[in-house]
A protein has these predicted regions:
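Extracellular, repeat-based ectodomains that mediate carbohydrate processing or recognition
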Residues: 1-236
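Beta-strand secondary-structure signal
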Residues: 97, 171, 239, 263-265, ...
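Low-complexity, Pro/Thr/Ser/Gly/Ala-rich linker/spacer regions in secreted
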Residues: 233-247
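C-terminal outer-membrane/trafficking sorting elements
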Residues: 243-284
């Protein structure tokens, strides 16, 4: 039988007054932890018996969470939370982490945040700003993973710190000390310029295990979306040596065949020479 968890009901119009973003996480001894956003802020509940019964009151991580906000060039955006518990044999075993985004620092300054609890969700740390750039830029659509072999935290997000327009990079923030400090590094090789006339999607994602990290994100350029990853390891991050791909894509021409104008499209994942050979219909 379904169990209602939220105490404060939300609207059904899909904005910050709607109860959304519940992503459960298992604890080390049969606990289930979940955080979500709604009219009562960013809140948390837990079960100590594998979800059979739940805590009676919502614990506020932050009192106000406007998760529905605008990002220039993106048709819609959200800052809904992700919950993870450290099940690793590290010193941070049992720590619960919640990651989200919001515009608490201003409509032109979207940021990524992280809070943690070391007492089973009873109390929460003050939000830690994940992105380490100067104020005034947009970071958005984050997702978090925890390597359960060592307790390292990884957060992937879109980032505009390097530009004055809507050009967008992809960054990874990671912590090796239980979320006390985070290192930021750019993992997308080139920026892209999205347009709000094309649906961009609502999520990134990331997994990590035994020092291997695989983030997933979307690029939107020239009206077309594509899905990307990066081939990363913790040792590469430490050495700042990584690439998003090893090989370049095949050159595509359109229309094909062509009578007058013909356009060529290709992507370079790293700096390299490009050679294009054009043949007529007879193969010459």
């Amino acid at each position: 039988v379904p169990i209602k968890l939220n105490e404060v009901d939300g609207s059904c119009i899909d904005n910050s007054t709607t109860v959304e973003g519940a992503v459960p996480a298992p604890g080390p001894s049969g606990q289930v932890y979940v955080a979500w956003s709604g009219p009562n802020g960013l809140v948390f509940k837990k079960s100590l018996d594998q979800g059979v019964t739940w805590s009676t009151t919502e614990t506020q991580i932050i009192a106000t969470h406007e998760w529905d906000f605008a990002i220039p060039g993106i048709d819609r955006c959200n800052g809904m939370p992700i919950t993870i518990c450290d099940l690793s044999p590290s010193a941070h075993h049992g720590t619960i982490y919640v990651n989200w985004a919001d515009q608490s620092n201003g409509a032109n300054d979207t940021d990524i945040f992280l809070s943690k609890s070391t007492d089973g969700g009873t109390t929460w740390s003050s939000p830690l700003r994940v992105n380490n750039d100067a104020p005034g830029k947009h970071q958005f659509l984050s997702w978090m993973a925890l390597d359960q072999t060592n307790g390292y935290i990884y957060i992937v997000f879109y980032d505009r710190r390097n530009y004055t327009n809507n050009n967008t990079d992809v960054y990874l923030a990671y912590s090796t000390d239980g979320g006390s400090t985070l290192t930021n590094t750019k993992i997308g090789t080139t920026s892209f310029l999205p347009t709000s006339s094309v649906f961009f999607g609502d999520y990134t994602n990331i997994v990590a295990h035994n020092g291997v990290i695989r983030p997933i994100w979307t690029r939107l350029a020239s009206g077309q979306t594509s899905v990307w990853t990066a081939i990363l390891s913790q040792s590469q991050l430490d050495a700042k040596e990584f690439e998003t791909q090893d090989d370049n894509t095949t050159i595509v021409n359109y229309p094909n065949p062509a009578e007058e104008d013909c356009y060529f499209a290709f992507k370079l994942y790293k700096e390299s020479p490009v050679s294009i050979t054009i043949y007529d219909l007879t193969g010459k």
